[in-house]
Amino acid sequence: MVTNTSGKKKTAVARATVSDGEGRVRINSQPVELVEPEMARLKMLEPFRISGSDLRGDVDIDIDVAGGGFAGQADAVRTAIARGLVEHYGDAELRDAFREFDRSLLVNDVRQRESKKWGGPGARARYQKSYR
């Protein structure tokens, strides 16, 4: 059985394909073990730590991720993996475990960066004003 899921965070979008296999996890056709920095890799593999690593040996997960930076991509990937595992196994207990740990494992974080406006260096900050 093949399951397609996706995850989003900021401008990063991850599309995951979960299929029966022997535990390979690939990010952009590269083994997840080669992902740097390590913090991003650990974030991506959180769903396996919560579910128990026995699930990882039964499935192959191929993920294509684009957009954003490494932190946003890591969050998008972990959402895609968690959704894929829940959908692939159809396990309500697994879904509840993910939801209890962190709701963003199953639900996309829709917050976006506020755009810069004129009259200042950022969205809310204004340029310094001088009276003399």
Curated annotation (Swiss-Prot):
Record-level GO BP terms: maturation of SSU-rRNA from tricistronic rRNA transcript (SSU-rRNA, 5.8S rRNA, LSU-rRNA); translation
Q: Does the keyword Plastid apply?
A: no
Family affiliation: Belongs to the universal ribosomal protein uS9 family.
Name the PROSITE patterns for this protein. RIBOSOMAL_S9
What protein name does the entry list?
Small ribosomal subunit protein uS9
Q: Which GO terms describe its molecular function?
A: RNA binding; structural constituent of ribosome
InterPro entries referenced in this protein's UniProt entry, alphabetically: Ribosomal_Su5_D2-typ_SF, Ribosomal_uS9, Ribosomal_uS9_archaeal, Ribosomal_uS9_CS, Ribsml_uS5_D2-typ_fold_subgr
Q: Which UniProt keywords apply?
A: Ribonucleoprotein, Ribosomal protein
GO cellular component entries: cytosolic small ribosomal subunit
Q: Which PANTHER family match?
A: RIBOSOMAL PROTEIN S16 (PTHR21569:SF16), RIBOSOMAL PROTEIN S9 (PTHR21569)
Q: Which domain of life is it from?
A: Archaea
